[in-house]
Amino acid sequence: MKDDMDSKNMTITAQHDRSARPYHHGHALAGILGPAFVAAVAYVDPGNVAANITSGARYGYLLVWVLVLANCMSVLIQYQSAKLGIVTGKSLPEILGERLGDAGRFMFFMQAEVIAIATDLAEVIGGAISLKLLFGLPLFVGGCIIGAVSTVLLIFEKGATHRIFEKLIIGLLLVITFGFIAGLFIAPPNPKEVVAGLIPRFKGTDTVLMATSMLGATVMPHAIYLHSTLVNDHYAPGEAKPSIKKLLHGSKIDVAWALILAGSVNLALLILAANSLYGMTGTDTIEGAQRAIQHVLGPVIGTIFSIGLLASSLSSTSVGTYAGSEIMHGLLRIKAPMWACRVVTLVPALVVLWFANNPTEALIVGQVVLSVGIPFAIIPLMRYTHDRTLMGEYVDGPVKHVVNIAVAALIVALNVVLIVLTMLGKA
């Protein structure tokens, strides 16, 4: 009798374990997701908003394929950054800090800090413009508000509250998605024209220059530095982590989903402009684009767009400051208070908002500075993920390394072209 009972209990337990196992795996995967969504915010910042709307308004659906190609390259680069962080347990700035001499660390930090300032410039200006559009606030006042609110968000970025920070940023990313896609429900595009835009082609020199600008600005330096940090900050001190293999598998899904979402937002912006703003003038600035959207699609869609822009600014400026803090920590081994890092990058943006007659010009300059910083982030990343002493059994194989180098070389070359064209006044 007792043996029968024991046998029955064992059967029930086994059935319970089998039924619980899929949930456990799914729950474990859900626990890994998050870092890539925070990094993906860099791909839907105000600078990208302006570029995608300008492309659609000028050239219609012609350059849809450029965004798709750009997104594919972004997936590869961001996964490499996550992989480096997962396997080594260190961020890219930390590894650079260990391998460079004192002078090299300082020089590398200086260029990275300039990149962080240029990044924040675009985010804060975009947010100030959104507050001006929504509430009629002066740009300087709007910039101060963006700085203050983003600083509050950064309170949650470390330790046990890091998951809260991730959820806040992901929430803002969803607001961005709705804000920038809403217009498509009012004026849906022609699917045939969208599909036709997937065929790689150009029409004149101007479209080549625009494609170069879009591809060249694909990868944001701070997103590369930060992603290798985020995968480790995702877990609180003392919290058990899955195995490296499980983390890498989860990271692939995390990166794919996050950048599909970010890529869809960028694609929606281009399609919205191609469908509703094609041929209209004045859409080469964020403010002009919003007014055009409001004129064509109505005040409700215009307001929703402005809210999306505000969410874009708040999330991207918070993530940019987070990246700057980690760069300082990794390269200089200084753990400065987050508010201090926030002030360093915020002040230049506020100065521009106070004195500049046309903030859009500052955005262009900032884009050039970002282009200069790309090689400093992407070349070390590709070098270290191919370093067996760092990566061990997870080192990139020869074929993957060749693909990585080809993508990195293309991005760096395009950024060099973008810099030259901008300096010549042609981009």
PLM segments and residue spans:
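Juxtamembrane transmembrane-helix boundary signature
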Residues: A39, V66-R99, F108-V114, L153, ...
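Transmembrane alpha-helical segments of multi-pass small-molecule transport proteins
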Residues: M107-E113, L134-F156, L174-G179, K335-V351, ...
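Transmembrane helix-loop boundary segments of multi-pass membrane transporters
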Residues: I53-T54, R58, L96, G126-F140, ...
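Hydrophobic alpha-helical segments and their helix-loop junctions in multi-pass secondary transporters
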Residues: L154, L173-I199, A211-S228, L381-T389, ...
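Extracellular loop-to-transmembrane helix junctions
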Residues: H27, T54-Y79, P93-G97, G104, ...
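Helix-loop-helix module between adjacent transmembrane segments
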Residues: M73-S81, A103-E123, L131-E157, G216-A217, ...
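Flexible loop linkers connecting adjacent transmembrane helices
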Residues: T11-R18, A51-G56, Y79-G104, F156-I164, ...
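Extracellular/periplasmic helix-exit of transmembrane alpha-helices
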Residues: S74-V87, V231-Y235, A240, I260-G288
